[in-house]
């Protein structure tokens, strides 16, 4: 399975997102309501390992990430960071790791819960990022890839939503 996490509105997704094989994708994007913010309760570690205890339709991200071979994020960036929606969903994905620590790539990180290591591809559609903001964003993606145990990562910058995004 491939996982797509995006922050596009329904109309923008319909207009700019072109997916050749929708059946192979689990698609997570903004819904009718906003996702509940992570409250730091660690219920996804203790009460329902691998699944967020906040049942709002976005609580299965840990399972999706644990079973995907490729993880694509489409996001707008402000100041070199993920959009608020994407950051919120990634925060809610902490269930992909265990609460204890191990050394990975010479750094201390949480032990991975799942054995697969998806490829991470991030497409950033902001049109006014400075070079410093782009560097910050690339570093954020690299850190996210390490935290999620991704095998590879890449970042593509496109100039706003003036072209189709092909997957």
Where are these regions (language model features)?
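Glycine-rich phosphate/pyrophosphate-binding loop and the adjoining helix
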Residues: 128-167
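Short histidine/acidic/glycine/proline-rich micro-motifs that form metal-
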Residues: 77-79, 126-131
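Short, conserved loop/helix-junction motifs that constitute active-site signature segments
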Residues: 111-118
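N-terminal beta1-alpha1-beta2 submodule of the flavodoxin-like/Rossmannoid cofactor-binding fold
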Residues: 1-98, 146, 154, 163-167
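Alpha-helical scaffolding within the catalytic cores
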Residues: 105-109
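Short hydrophobic beta-strand segments
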Residues: 1-5, 119-128
């Amino acid at each position: 399975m491939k996982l797509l996490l995006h922050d596009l509105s329904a109309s923008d997704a319909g207009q700019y997102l072109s997916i050749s094989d929708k059946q192979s994708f689990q698609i997570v994007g903004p819904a009718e309501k906003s996702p509940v913010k992570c409250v730091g309760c660690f219920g996804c570690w203790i009460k329902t390992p691998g699944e967020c205890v906040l049942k709002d339709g976005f609580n299965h991200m840990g399972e999706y990430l644990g079973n995907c071979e490729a993880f694509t994020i489409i996001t707008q960036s402000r100041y070199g960071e993920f959009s608020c929606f994407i950051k919120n969903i990634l925060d809610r994905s902490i269930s992909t790791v265990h609460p204890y620590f191990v050394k990975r790539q010479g750094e201390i990180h949480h032990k991975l819960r799942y054995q697969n290591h998806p490829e991470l591809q991030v497409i950033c559609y902001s049109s006014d990022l400075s070079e410093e903001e782009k560097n910050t964003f690339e570093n954020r993606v690299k850190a996210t890839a390490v935290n999620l145990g991704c095998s590879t990562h890449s970042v593509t910058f496109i100039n706003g939503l003036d072209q189709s995004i092909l997957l």
